[in-house]
């Protein structure tokens, strides 16, 4: 950066006003001595292509994709990191001279954080949701050695799609109309609804 021109990064989401990533990223940039700004952008699904073109045109270093763009963004990428390709969803895009590479840090971050409390290896898990974040969590947990993963989702097709994906590392269990009553070691919420709760749920684990 020279003079008053900072490098730009940001996030595309709906709703952007509820996304606290801007505070975290700008604090990290300042701590590292980087002259980079992070901008939250309100981007509805029908304007995602415009937002991507704008970021490339303005020379952004990259951007994050939050709800509801983590799967739709795949249509605009030139390449994906291997784990992101397996997950089929991206939350981080790197721009190198107009060449966009997608990465998914949701599942990796989840597993790293989880391991400070409980190792997912050999555990029975329930994942709520089947969207971008839930896909990342389920895939990375399967790769980390979870014994079983039960997907609970509102729509059958999307839930079965995710179950079939993680079946590569385990045994597929047939669809059930109700949530399983079998005791699980760990429940994780990968849905959008948890962002709107007035107070957090206290979910424990059993070992």
Predicted segments — roles?
Residues 2-118:
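Phosphate/diphosphate ligand-binding glycine-rich loop within oxidoreductases
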Residues 13, 114, 123-142:
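Glycine-rich adenosine-cofactor-binding loop
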Residues 146-166:
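NAD(P)-binding Rossmann-fold cofactor-contacting core
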Residues 164-177, 181:
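Short acidic low-complexity segments
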Residues 176, 180, 184-187, 198:
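Residue-level detector of alpha-helical secondary structure
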Residues 188-194:
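Charged, low-complexity interaction regions
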């Amino acid at each position: 950066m020279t003079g008053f021109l900072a490098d730009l990064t940001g996030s595309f989401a709906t709703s952007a006003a509820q996304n606290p990533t801007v505070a975290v990223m700008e604090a990290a940039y300042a701590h590292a001595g980087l002259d980079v700004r992070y901008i939250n952008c309100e981007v509805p699904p029908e304007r995602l292509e415009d937002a991507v073109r704008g970021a490339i045109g303005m020379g952004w270093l990259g951007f994050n994709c939050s709800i509801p763009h983590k799967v739709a963004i795949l249509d605009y990428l030139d390449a994906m990191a291997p784990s992101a390709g397996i997950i089929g969803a991206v939350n981080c895009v790197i721009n190198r001279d107009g060449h966009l590479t997608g990465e998914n840090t949701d599942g990796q971050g989840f597993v790293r954080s989880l391991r400070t409390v409980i190792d997912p290896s050999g555990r029975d898990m329930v994942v709520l949701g089947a969207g971008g974040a839930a896909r990342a969590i389920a895939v990375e947990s399967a790769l980390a050695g979870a014994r079983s993963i039960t997907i609970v989702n509102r729509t059958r097709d999307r839930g079965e799609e995710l179950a079939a994906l993680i079946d590569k590392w385990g045994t597929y269990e047939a669809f059930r109309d109700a949530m399983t009553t079998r005791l699980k070691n760990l429940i994780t919420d990968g849905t959008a609804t948890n962002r709107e709760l007035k107070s957090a749920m206290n979910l424990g684990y059993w070992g």
